[in-house]
Amino acid sequence: MKFRFGEGAEGTLNTSVTTAMIDQEKRAADLKRRKNQMLLFGGATLATLASCRLTARGISSRRYIPKMFQANHMPPQSDMVKEAAMAVVFATTMALSSFSMVVFGVAWSQDVTSLKQFALKMKTKLGAQQIEDEIRNAPMTPETQDLQDQLAGALKKD
């Protein structure tokens, strides 16, 4: 294939070189995207490990260990509201960090980069696209056709 650069200059277009350049750019973008997904998953994993460690430390610090000759059936008085609030905080941080780790892990393994792409993949895997096509291509019932004609007529009058 020949093309002209200007007045009288001719050259040949090497399609294999341009294809290789495009493939290299795609690979670089793919590598960058996968690295970003890996870092998100790693961050969520670190958050999960940190929240588990803080929860374990919080639980062990509240455990009552009696000293020598102390009664073990009557733990000391404590603030129940504070302990309940801390339990909610610990449970929430563990649940959110675990959920984020699962979400980022699934997104990384399934190669999903956005919510729109996730929705499209789920539709294709669950067969929703085929069902939508069947409904779209289904013949209209006479009642539906009559209603559509009435609405079209009412909108044309205005």
From Swiss-Prot:
Residues 136-158 are annotated as: Disordered. The keyword Signal does not apply. The keyword Coiled coil does not apply. InterPro entries: AIM11 (IPR038814). Keywords: Membrane, Transmembrane, Transmembrane helix. It is found in: Membrane. GO terms for cellular component: membrane. It is a multi-pass membrane protein. It comes from the Eukaryota. The chain crosses the membrane at residues 38-60, 84-106. Belongs to the AIM11 family. PANTHER family: ALTERED INHERITANCE OF MITOCHONDRIA PROTEIN 11 (PTHR39136:SF1). This is Altered inheritance of mitochondria protein 11. It comes from Yarrowia lipolytica (strain CLIB 122 / E 150) (Yeast). The lineage of its organism: Eukaryota, Fungi, Dikarya, Ascomycota, Saccharomycotina. The gene is AIM11.
